[in-house]
């Protein structure tokens, strides 16, 4: 994932969960075989089956925000594994308290309300077997949304902030469209155009690609000034070296 000469390699698998096909990521060290789930929204048996298939011991749950399709299985993972639940920002606790009630509206009945062991703040760091991940508070979709990223590994887990060709909804309670756009341009774009991201739903993309043609946050739309995106083959070469 990062510089292979100085840091352990990490593996990642993206596992769609819930009827909403939310992307849960499982990240683990191939040296210790310890790993974390990012945004375990539901389908606990499917998630634990994936961990068993790859021989991963789940030691943590990292949440980008409090919506039930991203956090609904966090408590179940902790109950089964003892994993520490980290994130999101404290401003999303009200959503974590409504997982069960909101799930009923979408026919998702296995979610559980949850309180994290630790909230995240802008600038915090997370670690998995010596590999450091940064945290950016990116409100807009929800007030307590965070993005978790590894800059040297050129990868980010953006939850529902950004998608291929779109951005997160802001018509939910306490959503704010302008705040969302500001979060993307001020917190994500400076990380670099070669950052590849796992969105909450749908396919992966790069920040450079979205700056080029996303109808909501392309540079031509926002007027953002910054480095232009790397050529696609350069991005692929970097990713091939960093993620194996």
Regions found by a protein language model. Name each.
Residues 21, 32-35, 42-127, 131, ...:
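Active-site HxH/HxHxD metal-binding segment of metal-dependent hydrolases
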Residues 40, 71, 180-184:
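Aromatic/hydrophobic pocket-lining residues that form the small-molecule binding cavity
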Residues 13, 62, 86, 118-120, ...:
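Hydrophobic/aromatic beta-strand patches that form the interior of the parallel beta-sheet core
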Residues 27, 64, 138:
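Conserved S/T- and glycine-rich ATP-binding loop of Class I adenylate-forming
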Residues 2-7, 110-111:
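Short, conserved catalytic or adaptor-binding loops enriched in Gly and charged residues
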Residues 33, 101-104, 125, 131-243:
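Metallo-beta-lactamase
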Residues 5-54, 147-159:
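Conserved beta-strand hairpin/beta-sheet module of binuclear metal-dependent hydrolase folds
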